[in-house]
């Protein structure tokens, strides 16, 4: 299978369509927030583009040129007073009107609007998902299926049974594994990696019957004659049904808990970038990897797509707040530096910083794309 065949197998037409929709809507709302906060402070927005690249269609409305561009991979807004202006002598200088004339807090409000919108989308999508589908109960391992003829079937385990304790110890919400926080229900796997006698406390809820609790004890050897042994179950976290309020609280908690993971993921990406290490990991995907994940989610269920959209918006919010010139976080940093100095940076200083930041972001994007494509060689 050549490279193009491998990519075609990974990226389905429906998946590509959903990728364009999810990514396009997320970036469109991000840019719309910048637009709204600028207009709310009396700053003109020269153009608003849905998509990138060559303009396919444009229309002037309310002082803004609204564009539809060729590539459905995002969008942008051109806010008056953000870009350098050329004077009558052909010299470029920093603007003094529009965005440039706003106080520091006003500029930060415009710049923060985009990432905060993605964050609110994250919380909103997560709240809807938790309200409809329930929240994961990480302290309970729900058996999803039992293989016919397996050891688990012989022990009387069934799909729908819930393991609540292992060897007399209640399963915790989370546990530490190798210095990292892991879900408690995954302790089932750890138990099955150890030889000896194990006891699972199992709850079974028959329809219309009270919950039954029983102890399932068995002797276990992880390997026999060099062959890995399998209990014969597929399991995941149990689910608790909650109302909107609890779903929102859980969404906030989940988002806060995800921040250290995002920091670690992007730190790892930057290390790989600076060392030109294109080896794969599961932490950060480029556009092709993201489209592949969305293709798989589209084949599963609408709720799988909601989960991917949630993660994408959280990643967009976090990435845009990284203090790299050219990103919202970098622009906010420059505003703060100017406020602390009591005067703006010179035209040459700001241009050099922004050009360096833009080049870094473009090279990082190219690196991620190359790393994505390298999987198919």
UniProtKB/Swiss-Prot annotation:
Membrane topology label: Multi-pass membrane protein
Membrane-spanning intervals of the chain: 108-130, 303-325, 351-370
InterPro entries linked: PDZ, PDZ_6, PDZ_sf, Pept_M50_Zn, Peptidase_M50
Enzyme superclass (EC): hydrolase
Any GO BP: proteolysis
Keyword hit for Hydrolase: yes
Location of the protein in the cell: Cell membrane
Transmembrane helix among keywords: yes
Name of the protein: Putative zinc metalloprotease DR_1507
Native species: Deinococcus radiodurans (strain ATCC 13939 / DSM 20539 / JCM 16871 / CCUG 27074 / LMG 4051 / NBRC 15346 / NCIMB 9279 / VKM B-1422 / R1)
